[in-house]
C-alpha cells in the first residue's frame, strides 16, 4: 500500500469516526435524552475539523517541516485561553450544564481555523519559536494575576473542598494546566534561545503557581512526561541514560522526605501527594472505575454518548481510557485509543532527538498522561486532533508507516 493511499484511508477513518460521533449526538437529540444544542454544535465543529485536516492531507507531500508544530502550538494557545476562561467563570460553568462546552468549541474551532488561515497567509513568518514566545508572555501575565482572580490562599487550605472553593470551582485545575503549559514552554525557550534569562522568571512563577494550586493530576503527569523525555532522549548515550535512571530511582526512594519538605512551603499539594503515596488515596476514583466497568459491560458496542454517561459525578469517571469506552463503546473506543494515544506516542518518540521538539513532545506526553486522571474526553479529543496533524508531519519526513 502506498503512503498516500494509507494516508487517505486513515483520514477517511478519522472523518468516519467524527461523523459517527456527530450523528450519534444528533440522533440522541432527536429521539430524547439529549445533551443539548450546545453539544450538537460541539460535535459539528469536530466534524468540520476532520474535514479541514483531510483537505490539508491532500497536500501532505508539500507540507513544510514545522507546519505541524505551528498547528499544535496554535491549538495549545487556544487551550490556554480555554483554561483561563474556566478559571475566571468557574462558578457559572458549574451552575449551568453544558456551558463549559462553549469553551471547548473555542478550543477546537478557533484553534483549527486560526491555524489554517495562519498556514495560508503567514507561514513564512510564523514559526514554533515565535508562537512559544507569544504563549509564554501571555501565560506569564495570567500567572501574575491568578492570585487576585482566585483569591488563592495556600496557608488556609487543608483539604480538597477548601482547595476547590479557593480556586472557584474548576479554578485550581485550570491554574495547574496554565502553570504546566507555562513551565513546558519556558523550558523550551530556555533550550532554544540565547537570551535564556528572559524566560527564567516565568518558569519560576509557573512552578510556584502550579504547586500552590494544589491539584496533583497535572503535576504528576508533568513529572512523568519530563522523565519520559529524558529517558528516551538519552537512549543512545549509556552514561546519560544511567544518570537519568539513577535520578528517577532517587526520586522514588526519597519521595516521602521530598513531599514532606514540599509540605512545609505548599501544604495543600504536599498533603494530597502524601495521601496518594502513603495511603493510596485516589479521591474516589476507584469507585468510579468500578461503576465504569459495569456500564461498559452493560452496553459494550454503542456506549452512552458524551453527555449521557450515568456516572455518580456526571458524565465522566476521571479516566481518559474508560471515558472513551463509555462514550463510544468498545469498537470505536479502540480506534480512538489507537489514533489518539498509540500513534501520538510513536510520533512524539520519533522527534525526541532534537531539542527544538521539546515543547510538542513533552506536551504530547503530558496531555496523554493527564487525561488518565482528569477530564478524559476533552483531553483525548485534543490528542486526537494533535495526532492527525502530527501524523501528517511525521509522514512528510519519513517513509515509515
Protein language model regions, located:
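Hydrophobic transmembrane alpha-helices and their immediate junctions
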Residues: 58, 130, 328-368, 393-399
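Alpha-helical transmembrane segments of multi-pass inner-membrane proteins
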Residues: 129-155, 170-232, 365
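N-terminal signal-anchor transmembrane segment
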Residues: 1-58, 74-87, 147-148, 367-369, ...
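Aromatic-anchored transmembrane helix interface
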Residues: 41-46, 68-83, 92-120, 134, ...
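Long extracytoplasmic/lumenal interhelical loops at the membrane interface
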Residues: 274-329
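Membrane-interfacial helix-loop-helix modules of multi-pass inner-membrane proteins that assemble, modify
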Residues: 84-99, 130, 137-175, 264-272
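Transmembrane alpha-helices of multi-pass inner-membrane enzymes
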Residues: 14-18, 184, 359-370, 376-401
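A membrane-periplasm/extracellular boundary helix in multi-pass inner-membrane enzymes
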Residues: 147-148, 233-275, 294
Amino acid at each position: 500500500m502506498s503512503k498516500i493511499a494509507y494516508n487517505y484511508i486513515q483520514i477517511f477513518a478519522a472523518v468516519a469516526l467524527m461523523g459517527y460521533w456527530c450523528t450519534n449526538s444528533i440522533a440522541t437529540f432527536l429521539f430524547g435524552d439529549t445533551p443539548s444544542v450546545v453539544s450538537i454544535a460541539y460535535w459539528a465543529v469536530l466534524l468540520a475539523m476532520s474535514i479541514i485536516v483531510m483537505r490539508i492531507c491532500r497536500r501532505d507531500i508539500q507540507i513544510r517541516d514545522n507546519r505541524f508544530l505551528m498547528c499544535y502550538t496554535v491549538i495549545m494557545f487556544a487551550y490556554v485561553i480555554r483554561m483561563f476562561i474556566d478559571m475566571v467563570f468557574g462558578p457559572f460553568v458549574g451552575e449551568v450544564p453544558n456551558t463549559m462546552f462553549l469553551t471547548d468549541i473555542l478550543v477546537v474551532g478557533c484553534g483549527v481555523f486560526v491555524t489554517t488561515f495562519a498556514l495560508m497567509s503567514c507561514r513564512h513568518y510564523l514559526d514554533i519559536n515565535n508562537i512559544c514566545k507569544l504563549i509564554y508572555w501571555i501565560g506569564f501575565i495570567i500567572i501574575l494575576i491568578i492570585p487576585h482572580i482566585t483569591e488563592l490562599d495556600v496557608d488556609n487550605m487543608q483539604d480538597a473542598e477548601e482547595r476547590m472553593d479557593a480556586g472557584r470551582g474548576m479554578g485550581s485545575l485550570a491554574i495547574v494546566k496554565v502553570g504546566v503549559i507555562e513551565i513546558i514552554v519556558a523550558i523550551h525557550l530556555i533550550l532554544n534561545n540565547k537570551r535564556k534569562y528572559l524566560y527564567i522568571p516565568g518558569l519560576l512563577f509557573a512552578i510556584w503557581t502550579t504547586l500552590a494550586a494544589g491539584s496533583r493530576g497535572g503535576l504528576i503527569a508533568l513529572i512523568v512526561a519530563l522523565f519520559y523525555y529524558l529517558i528516551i532522549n538519552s537512549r543512545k548515550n549509556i552514561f546519560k541514560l544511567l544518570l537519568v535512571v539513577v535520578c528517577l530511582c532517587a526520586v522514588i526512594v526519597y519521595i516521602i522526605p521530598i513531599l514532606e519538605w514540599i509540605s512545609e512551603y505548599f501544604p495543600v499539594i504536599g498533603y494530597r501527594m502524601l495521601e496518594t503515596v502513603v495511603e493510596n488515596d485516589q479521591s474516589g476514583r476507584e469507585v468510579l472505575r468500578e461503576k465504569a466497568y459495569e456500564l461498559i459491560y452493560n452496553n459494550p458496542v454503542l456506549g452512552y454518548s458524551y453527555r449521557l454517561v450515568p456516572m455518580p459525578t456526571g458524565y465522566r469517571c476521571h479516566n481518559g481510557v474508560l471515558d472513551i469506552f463509555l462514550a463510544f463503546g468498545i469498537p470505536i473506543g479502540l480506534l480512538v485509543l489507537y489514533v489518539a494515544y498509540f500513534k501520538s506516542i510513536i510520533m512524539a518518540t520519533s522527534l525526541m532527538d532534537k531539542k527544538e521538539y521539546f515543547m510538542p513532545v513533552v506536551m504530547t506526553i503530558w496531555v496523554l498522561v493527564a487525561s488518565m486522571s482528569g477530564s478524559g474526553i476533552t483531553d483525548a479529543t485534543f490528542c486526537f486532533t494533535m495526532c492527525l496533524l502530527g501524523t501528517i508531519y511525521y509522514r512528510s519526513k519519513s517513509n515509515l508507516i
